[in-house]
């Protein structure tokens, strides 16, 4: 007669695989203000999860984590999208995008089928991710720098119409 093993609870056993490790990263970033990958690695190590910088960097990228600085330009903290999933359309995405536009959009500009959005330093990736997740039919995609997002409009929408829409949503 064989005995079934009980499922492990949170700890190194669960985090031994990529999904478990990434779940712990999301939990840590959701509950603590982590300012560096070294700090995150130390927090994981305290839980018995050893990770290389390369693996941690890859995990953060896959989770869509970005380092977000406030408008004062101070030291940034890592944040992950609210649901911790890869970028794709999500329910409630437009509400979240509108909230982030209100918090992060500094100004807009446009040219042809392009809208240019300005944010505080370090916030562009976070806002661009929210725009991508909203899966707006008039948006082909986004490209984000440190404080600037290039949003490509799907024809027949123009960049001016798109910039106006983002202004009105904030």
UniProtKB/Swiss-Prot annotation:
Pathway: Amino-acid biosynthesis; L-arginine biosynthesis [regulation]
Species for this entry: Mycobacterium tuberculosis (strain ATCC 25618 / H37Rv)
Matches recorded under Gene3D superfamilies: 3.30.1360.40, Winged helix-like DNA-binding domain superfamily/Winged helix DNA-binding domain
A Pfam match: Arg_repressor
The protein's role, per its UniProt record: Regulates arginine biosynthesis genes.
Protein family membership: Belongs to the ArgR family.
GO MF entries: arginine binding; cis-regulatory region sequence-specific DNA binding; DNA binding; DNA-binding transcription factor activity
Keyword Cytoplasm: yes
Domain of life: Bacteria
Biological-process GO terms, alphabetical: L-arginine biosynthetic process; protein complex oligomerization; regulation of arginine biosynthetic process; regulation of arginine metabolic process
InterPro entries: Arg_repress, Arg_repress_C, Arg_repress_C_sf, Arg_repress_DNA-bd, WH-like_DNA-bd_sf, WH_DNA-bd_sf
GO cellular component: cytoplasm; transcription regulator complex
Cysteine disulfide partners in this protein: none
Claim: Cytoplasm is one of the keywords in the record: yes
Protein name per its UniProtKB record: Arginine repressor
Subcellular location: Cytoplasm
Keywords: Amino-acid biosynthesis, Arginine biosynthesis, Cytoplasm, DNA-binding, Repressor, Transcription, Transcription regulation
Segments traversing the membrane: none
């Amino acid at each position: 007669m064989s005995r079934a093993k009980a499922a492990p609870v949170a700890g190194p056993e669960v985090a031994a695989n990529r999904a478990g490790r990434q779940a712990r990263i999301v939990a840590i970033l959701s509950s603590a203000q982590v300012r560096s990958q070294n700090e995150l690695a130390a927090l994981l190590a305290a839980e018995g999860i050893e990770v290389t910088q390369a693996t941690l960097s890859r995990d953060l990228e896959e989770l869509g984590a970005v380092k977000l600085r406030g408008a004062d330009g101070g030291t940034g903290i890592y944040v992950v999208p609210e649901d911790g999933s890869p970028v794709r359309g999500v329910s409630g995405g437009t509400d979240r995008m509108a909230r982030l536009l209100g918090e992060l959009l500094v100004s807009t500009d446009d040219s042809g089928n392009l809208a240019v959005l300005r944010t505080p330093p370090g916030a562009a990736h976070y806002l661009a991710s929210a725009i991508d997740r909203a899966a707006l039919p008039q948006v082909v995609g986004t490209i984000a720098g440190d404080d600037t997002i290039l949003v490509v409009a799907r024809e027949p929408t123009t960049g001016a119409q798109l910039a106006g829409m983002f202004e009105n949503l904030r």
